[in-house]
């Protein structure tokens, strides 16, 4: 019988570990590219783009094996930290849309610092974990920031809710109104969509006006579907 040496076992384990990390990075890449479309023009656009760069560099490092610029022992921590980046961005888009702009500015900055640390080949595992903890603490801190008042100028995050409503309305219109309902119904709904786009593009529109436009557009769609 052949005797399996510790070196062979370690090599197999390392290969399995590298394969698992590569699969995780592929998943992260898909998630980040999906998020990218939703954060254009926001405080999260830069960290998302840099996180995508991190994924590609780590994938290259895993393929390069011993030639990597990263310490192989630290790659696992970097991959784990990328998951924390994705979770932090998701948290921000879900919970900070109605907060004052500073909440998103601070959160975007904190996430960017974490991504930079992941990218830094000289960053230690401890320093990466410390930055992850800083981001988690920041999540709790920004939740205490004031909410936007109805009379405050709408932020890009407030407007994103209207933007989604516009796209959803267009999609439903093309599927259930166009060539299904009479032209008058189609035309009336189009006017409501055009008005909503005007509100969204208005740099001085208030939170209250955006919220009201969402309600108006939803009502226009329901009327068209009757």
UniProtKB/Swiss-Prot annotation:
Segments carrying the region annotation (IgG constant region-binding) are: 37-100
Primary localisation category: secreted
* sequence repeats (start-end): 158-168, 169-179, 180-190
**What is an example of a GO molecular function annotated in this UniProt entry?**
IgG binding
Q: Which domain of life is it from?
A: Bacteria
Q: Where are the transmembrane segments?
A: none
- Which keywords belong to this entry? IgG-binding protein, Repeat, Secreted
Q: Name one GO cellular component term.
A: extracellular region
**What is its subcellular localisation?**
Secreted
Short name of one Pfam family for this protein?
A: CAMP_factor
What role does this protein play?
Protein B belongs to the group of bacterial Fc-binding protein.
Put simply, this protein is called Protein B
